[in-house]
């Protein structure tokens, strides 16, 4: 008989004595000209869980320029679960540039030593997190979909995609140094704001001169995203998979989405076939979504797709295979050909919504 494989043991790493009593969790509040990215509030929900496990305090860190609602923004992390908020405000911090933002954040970390520092896995967050981790000489787990604290070791464990999204790995931070850092994908559960909560706002002085910075801001051009997919924050998504067979049939997804006022999503094979752009891909190597309604047409429900959408409030699956994995976690299932079911749904919704419009 072959021997049973031994269970992996937890790797114990002796903490640097400087960090033994460190317990606080920080969330970097991402904002642009006074507008906060929603991922910041989602991270505060994750941060609150970590703090409750560690027994420390949760801080929001706001970095911005003068006149960008700095103090007002600092009140919002408290309403979303933070105990306190740091405010770093300076003219040089008005528009994001890596050098001043890295200096602002690393100087603050060095002075106060948090246990964990979280940033959104956004364009800004990914750029800033790497340079901060390198400057501090600490570890960084990027593009996480889930975070968990090991209360025994105080290590931060995470779930993230690997091998181009075909597998999930669960790296754990076993290091002597702090903070433990992670960038987290948007569209995790967002805590409900509580206007009755209050907390301290700590203004932190920051000093840097323009000549110290290599990059220069020449002009600010707002990003017009009206015609771009915004899957992570859509309330309704209609997504199609290879069960639709060809690009012409994928148009049926667009037809239903138009009637419902929904965003269009796609599985990875659809994007690879060129039927939909990459920004519409849902799943481990695409977008993580949490809509109120997710309609999956011709999608089998493989793990790579599931991890990107199983947080939806309601999932309706359409598939010809009654044993398709998607039926294991869908709230409602239609065993049938999506090519015939989608037009029927489109007409039914169109008629019902028309009736409601006339009545109301």
Swiss-Prot record:
Binding positions (FAD): 293-321
Protein name in the entry: Protein FixB
Species annotation: Azotobacter vinelandii
Top-rank taxon, per record: Bacteria
Electron transport in keyword set: yes
UniProt keyword terms in alphabetical order: Electron transport, FAD, Flavoprotein, Nitrogen fixation, Transport
Entry-linked Pfam families: ETF (PF01012), ETF_alpha (PF00766)
Entry-linked SMART domains: ETF
Family of the protein in this entry: Belongs to the ETF alpha-subunit/FixB family.
Function: May play a role in a redox process involved in nitrogen fixation.
Subunit relationships: FixA and FixB form a heterodimer.
GO biological process terms on file: fatty acid beta-oxidation using acyl-CoA dehydrogenase; nitrogen fixation
Cross-referenced InterPro entries: DHS-like_NAD/FAD-binding_dom (IPR029035), ETF_a/b_N (IPR014730), ETF_a/FixB (IPR001308), ETF_alpha_N (IPR033947), ETF_asu_C (IPR014731), ETF_asu_C_CS (IPR018206), Rossmann-like_a/b/a_fold (IPR014729)
A Gene Ontology molecular function term of the record: flavin adenine dinucleotide binding
